[in-house]
Amino acid sequence: VETHQPVTRYGAPSGPVRIGLLDGHRVAFLARHGEGHSLPPHQINYRANLAALHALGAGRVLALNTVGGITADFGPRVLGCPDQLIDYTWGRISTICEEPGTEVVHVDFGEPYTRSLRNDVIAAAAAAGVALVDGGCYGATQGPRLETRAEIARMRRDGCDLVGMTGMPEAGLAREMGLDYACLAIVANWAAGAGPDPDEVITLQDVLDNVAAASSGLPRLIASLLARQTAE
């Protein structure tokens, strides 16, 4: 495994980028929350993270996001690949088009996730026998606190199926940088008031167990995705 500590024009990324071989394919991994999960969502340097991956040769980014479920198809232990998102964050640097001399580019963001990569992920999951919900809307909130029941009720009315804290500005920045980008949403728990028991108390152990269950097929899915990329 190679370990890289790149510094980009946007500063340092959240931590080292590790590059290794998976079934003969070079794969880069970067923990967006930093070593030991030390960075809250609003303090992540999303620009530097993506720029570091880009500089090391990455052209496709598969983002892993732990989320809460809002609608019935996205209960705990579900793995999803959303096709839409709504941004509720604020105060985060959300563009690379703000430095002096930088050309302002108004990128098309009607489909926030790259369709070709999403299609490959969905096909790879099917080939690997990994259950995956195709579609859904990810609502990106500010964090690090969790949401109120009223906020989740509003998000449901807005059309959100999932809620997380790191989906934006990451997806928008990836589009500006020309990176293919898709999300694998790992449902850890019901969002506030969204489950069948609105008074349910979620424990840390519940969350850890649910994440482990939803993530169990990821190695097979990713291996299948890499095999498809080679075939293409």
What is the role of each PLM region?
Residues V1-F109:
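Metabolite-binding pocket within alpha/beta catalytic cores that recognizes anionic/polar moieties
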Residues H54-G57, R156, R175:
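Non-catalytic positions within long, well-ordered alpha-helices that form the structural scaffold/packing
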Residues M165-Q205:
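Zn-dependent metallopeptidase/amidohydrolase metal-coordination segment
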Residues E111-R156:
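Active-site rim beta-loop-alpha module in soluble metabolic enzymes
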Residues G59-R60, D161, D180:
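Short acidic/polar active-site loop segments enriched in Thr and Asp
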Residues L50, I152, M168-A171:
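Generic hydrophobic/aromatic pocket-lining and core-packing "Φ" positions
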Residues A191-E232:
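His/Asp/Glu-rich mid-to-C-terminal helical/loop segments that flank catalytic regions of hydrolases
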